[in-house]
Amino acid sequence: MLTTRPGAGQYETPNYDQHVARAEICLADAYQTILTCDFAEHGRLLPALAGLTLEQWIAGVRQIGPALNVGQLTKAEGFAGVLRDNGIDPDPELVRALVDKDRELLLANGRLYPDALPFLRALRERGIKIAIVSNCSEGTRELLTELGVAALADTMVLSCEVGAAKPAAEIYQRALKQLGAAAEAAVFVDDQPGFCAGAAALGITTAQILRNGPGETAATAEGTPDGVRVVYSLAEVEAMFPA
């Protein structure tokens, strides 16, 4: 179930006194910004399929996670390594079954936030170029395509495909280059304060989105970097662009 602020069912753009004067492009994170995914079934079904305990599976996935995120390992290679490290023969059929189940569960449990498509459509109608900039492993491009995001984005810069992950400067710069814009012409939105800081350090106007609403502020505001706007909906991000 998605958590949104009161009244978020209707897409209304707030008015801000000041807009980003030169904003021409939008860089948007994927997970917990435009979409969410319930990974509970991953934790229940994949360890059982692998013949491991939940603890063994989680430890293994955490170990391979950074390499998956920058494309140094495929899911098949990573899962084979988890099996091997736990004394299980990485039989190709078992590895393929794990990869297929992981993909199936990602596609089945990924959900857009209600304001995601209206936000992307509104930006396109205003001629604002869009890049999805996500730290992710293989499967996310297919998920974004299935959910209708790929059709509305001008480009998708995925860490597993470009070999760099937020908050490294390279991934933001790759998105800027693909959209043909300078950092000063961009607005970036992400839920993670560290990733917001990485963008802000390049001169990109940045917003941290708190999907649980104003009540989340007390727990997270301390981690919001200086100069980063806190927002609770994508409508607020749209309002950061000049009318």
Describe the function of each predicted region.
Residues 128-130:
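Short beta-strand/loop segments at the ligand-binding rim of alpha/beta enzyme cores
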Residues 2-118, 125-126:
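N-terminal helical cap/lid subdomain that shapes the substrate entry/recognition surface
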Residues 1-28, 117, 121-124, 133, ...:
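Asp-based, Mg2+/Mn2+-dependent phosphohydrolase catalytic module
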